[in-house]
Amino acid sequence: MGWQIASSRLTHDFSALPFKMKELTLLIKITPQVDGSGLRLILQNRFNHTALLFDELIVSHDEKMSDAKSITRGKQKQIAIVGNGAVHTDALPFEVIAGQPLYFRMRALQKQTYADFSCVYDETFYNAIMAGTKNAAPHLPHNWQARKGWFCISCLEVWTNKKTPIIELTGDSLAETGMIETGLIKQLLNQAVVVNTGISGNRLLHDAPQDGPLYQTFGQSLIKRATQSTDPHPHPIIALIGSNDLVLPLIDGQSAHELVTPGQYLAGVSQLKQILDDRRCPLILTTIPPFSPHVAPQQENILLDAQQRRLLINQELRRFEWVVDLDPWLLGNDGGLKEIYDFGDHLHLNAAGGMVAAQAIMQKLSQLGYEKSF
């Protein structure tokens, strides 16, 4: 018996765009990927200098919280998370079934600022809603095109006799939205745990631009994140990255001076591969998916150039056996995403697009022999 990660989603640095709440009620659905007889949470406050207090943290098997149990820390119901830190909650005996959602409600009675933020669009395995009052009884939303976000909860661990392998899904919003993650979890449930470290706006080569609060949430470059990771356990890492290296210069002034050539991108891929090889974490990289976002007329030539660089980069990436070619699945006749897989912005994937991308990734995992270890 031991503790095993059953669900994990990275909390992002929103210190440049913090949430200031007089009071807070959070309702979060998290679906464990491992069975267990007990649970505990990791609560993050890494991007806030001030401690956070939660006056209530409870868990239930249903959204109405009908069998709710208190989650404590140090046997106290009020939980403090130190500034720039993280805490484990106490262990709670509680039945956990892989694929069956758990519902967590958090309340804070005092005015606080929250900077550790996680979000999702696909509602299959995660969902959340927040309210700015302490006595709210919110209901989870059902709108796959709307962002659902929560604070502080980054990892659910369960007490189990199983040892389930970890697969990390990382990169940019193509990972973060949950569309591809959902497809992978559906195919790997009870075989492997998919953990998500995707960050919206993330790039392979460059850190977040600093010329706007939203841009500042885009995180450090994936190369830097891979270098600084403290995870000592080898595991496969699936990366969806590169779209923002090409597209961000179209919308952001600072990024316009960070145009990436195919040679620079491919050198960055080689560097990422070496970093992960040194960590004994096999890299499974996808080609850069098609994109055709709406741009102003004066930017059309810049967009065409970015699309051409995408084609040149992907042409070289296909030479590597550890690369998943998404173009046969996603590329439309107009050079952008197929309409049936388009989220609506000609850049991101809808649920159907996430499922076919996950299918392509699963085929590559099988070709590389990883299914034998699941």
Summary of predicted features, one role per range:
Residues 269-273, 314:
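Generic structural signal for well-ordered alpha-helices
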Residues 156, 163-270, 294, 348:
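Conserved SGNH/GDSL esterase-like catalytic core that processes O-acyl groups on lipids
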Residues 1-170, 175-182, 189-190, 297, ...:
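N-terminal secretory targeting modules
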Residues 279-282:
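A short helix->loop->beta-strand "cap" motif at the edges of active sites that frequently abuts
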